Amino acid sequence: IGIFKLVLEANGFAEFKLKKEGGNWVLDIKEEDRGKPTFALYTGTESDEEKEIVRNVFNGDWKFIPPTLEAQIKLISGNNLYGEVIKVFMITASGAEGISLKNTRYVHIMEPYWHPVRIQQVIGRARRICSHQELPEELRTVDVFLYLMEFSEEQLSSDDTI
């Protein structure tokens, strides 16, 4: 995820971040990054409350977002059907179980050490029944990409790869 975060930033994305200010959750996005497409991290380093708020923003569930934050987000967009607020939602193993995501059109599996059952769980987060009902019928699809690494013969025979 760290490398993909850098790739996104190099391609004009900004991280969707929150902070608590005076007891209220507020956006923590630099002024120069406002208006850029954003990505969010769901890694286990965030508090449970913060992760839940970010997930609700991604899902467009405004009724579960604190009012101060909701007002700020609605200045960006009134929904997140097409990624208007958060376009990319990156999850580590901490996000593989127990959450539902809405309107997710693409799943990219980039961590090589996941067990096949875990991969199916991750895909299942994006393919829940009725999770795409707010989208037009032709957009109610989920494409899954599994990235694999392949070593060359030279790399396999070299002692440098041990």
Positions of predicted regions on the chain:
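A conserved SF2-helicase RecA2
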Residues: V117-I123, R127-I162
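Conserved helicase ATPase core of P-loop NTP-dependent helicases/translocases
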Residues: E21-A93
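Conserved helix-turn-beta segment of the N-terminal RecA-like "Helicase ATP-binding" lobe
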Residues: V7-E15
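Conserved strand-helix element at the start of the C-terminal RecA-like helicase core
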Residues: I1-L6
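Flexible phosphate/Mg2+-sensing switch loops adjacent to catalytic phosphate-binding sites
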Residues: E15-W25, Q133-E137
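Conserved nucleotide-binding/hydrolysis micro-motifs of P-loop NTPases
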Residues: E46-D48, G95-E97, Y113-H115, L148-E154
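Short glycine-/polar-rich loops that comprise or flank the Walker A/P-loop
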Residues: R34-T38, K102-Y106, E134-V144
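Conserved RecA-like helicase motor core of SF1/SF2 enzymes
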Residues: A93-Q133
